[in-house]
Amino acid sequence: MAKPGRTPAKGAGTSARILHDGLVIASHGRHCLVETPTGERLICHPRGKKSQAVVGDRVRWQASEDEGTIEEVVPRRNLFYRQDEIRTKSFAANLDHVLILIAAEPEFSEHQLARALIAAEAERITPIIALNKSDLAEPFERAWNKLAPYRRMHHGVLPLSLKASGEADYASLMKLLAGKSTLVLGPSGAGKSTLINLLVPGATALTGEISQALNSGKHTTTSTTWYWVDEARTTSLIDSPGFQEFGLNHIAPMQLAGLMPDIAEHANDCKFYNCTHLHEPGCGVIANVDAPGKPGPISATRYRIYGELFAELSQSRY
């Protein structure tokens, strides 16, 4: 694999009218590291102030002396967002899977998990939940039981013990990920670095090379990086450090129920067509929420998360 930023890609210095195909594998600010179909890499800059390419974008770029200009972003299959207190920003595109890695310890946030699943559902990306640290018997059992609503929603939950049974976990993961582009997400302490290095030996060194090529200094928590798992470049991982709040502001409040499978299953049973599932009489969702003395298929925690997100999305529009 070519060293990033060391070898100019073929076509550099040729006619400016020629456009070349490329894949964005990393970005920092307005600098993108683009890989050509032959595996060479070069720095490119998007054309125009508002133009922005993200990791996973297929682009068409124009050569200059030693860098390039991204002239076109090929239409995306999907786009993933993150948000902070100030804004929502896209950060990865053209994904087949989102692998959400959580652990038996420390205890994971079901709210963050729900946000990630909703973001994936909105873009029609297949989510995979992986629960690490299966060697910790009691914490793992608690976490596994906590995930029961997600298993009922047909979200596969893959048990892992990355430090205790890495070889077996490698085989299990590759059965799911082979031939796909997968965004890997997870909170601190879940074992995401261990997973990345299991599937991509030397990923730490590659990250350093990419950071150097982009002049971004030390690898930061906001950088997103594409790694090839195999030499044939058919299987890839996209690592986005941290477990940020996923941007949901592009989703209208009334769309939310349709993006939560357990809620959606009962949303058509409501008396009113425009039911918010929060307070209306004859609501099919409310009637199916689990409660003391009245078991139901929708967990009380999931319904609470729905209400919180509905309020958040309603507020963001004013």
Curated annotation (Swiss-Prot):
Please state where this protein is localized. Cytoplasm
Give the domain of life.
Bacteria
Which coenzyme or cofactor does it need?
Zn(2+)
Protein species of origin: Variovorax paradoxus (strain S110)
List its EC numbers: 3.6.1.-
Q: Which residues form the signal peptide?
A: none
Q: Main site of residence?
A: cytoplasm
What is one GO biological process annotated to this record? ribosomal small subunit biogenesis
NCBIfam families the record matches: ribosome small subunit-dependent GTPase A
Q: Which UniProt keywords apply?
A: Cytoplasm, GTP-binding, Hydrolase, Metal-binding, Nucleotide-binding, Ribosome biogenesis, RNA-binding, rRNA-binding, Zinc
One Gene Ontology cellular component annotation? cytoplasm
Cofactor: how and how many bound = Binds 1 zinc ion per subunit.
Q: What class of enzyme is it?
A: hydrolase
HAMAP family in the cross-refs: GTPase_RsgA
Its quaternary organisation is: Monomer. Associates with 30S ribosomal subunit, binds 16S rRNA.
Which InterPro entries does the annotation name? G_CP_dom, NA-bd_OB-fold, P-loop_NTPase, Ribosome_biogen_GTPase_RsgA, RsgA_GTPase_dom, RsgA_N
Q: Name one Pfam family in it.
A: RsgA_GTPase
Q: What is this protein called?
A: Small ribosomal subunit biogenesis GTPase RsgA
